[in-house]
Amino acid sequence: MNEQSNNVLAEEFRFFMTWGKYRDYKNLKLLISEPNDVRLAVDKAYTDMSTRTIKGLSLEFKGNEALKKVCKDEKWEETKNSLIDGCKKQLTDSIIELFKPYAKATENKTGAENSNIDFSEKLVKISNHFLDDYKSAMEILNNSILKVPNSTTYRIDVENIKYGKAQKVVNMTCKYLMLFSDASDYKKVFQQCEMPLDSKILEYYNEIIVKSLNESRNNEIQKCTTAWSNLEYEEYKDIQKNIKEFCERNKNNDLNLTGYPLIDEFTIWKNQINK
């Protein structure tokens, strides 16, 4: 096998390992303008949501034969996959709608770069919509579980599915879209997106961002002691506000930041992994 063939196979393998698709896309390129490609980003971001931490979703029967029979008869696993697929589809549509106006603006040269649209409210709306859809889907699954007597301990813990989960899937979707071939057409969108919060980012937030901002303010910012998946919206909003201020204060200095949280997440996350 010659070197060129090796390089092609290596690139195909890299693409497969990243997106879970093999030889499905011409030239191994993904486009934000293609809905099916955006769905790939949503699927990958969903795995980052860490659904394994949602109590009851894996449905461990632990010897409960009655529950096992009911779930088999009602095709619980198939229903779960279908409901989650519906949530992903709705999120995909919402993300496409968020990006679409900028595709038109770029194409028609109508001055998208000068727009002052604030995407934060749109991202909150998308995240809350996904959270509501997802929790509703989990309640439907609980209805099957609760048909069996004494099965309440097996139910999905819907009450503890917090905003932190929703922000992760939405913000990570946007992050993955930055890897797409036409990402440069949507620069203004990415500049206004928010930083995905996970354990590494919150570690940096507590160690670096809180300390830095407290040194420049009269008031004291508190460290975040909540796990990212358990964040409520108000705490999340305060963290994002502080992250944005920190990124803007430190752009073009030795921290190598741009002033845009989502873009700077690549640098910060890499530094946290490598420290």
What are these regions (language model features)?
Residues 2-160:
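Phosphate/adenylate-binding glycine loop and adjacent helical scaffold
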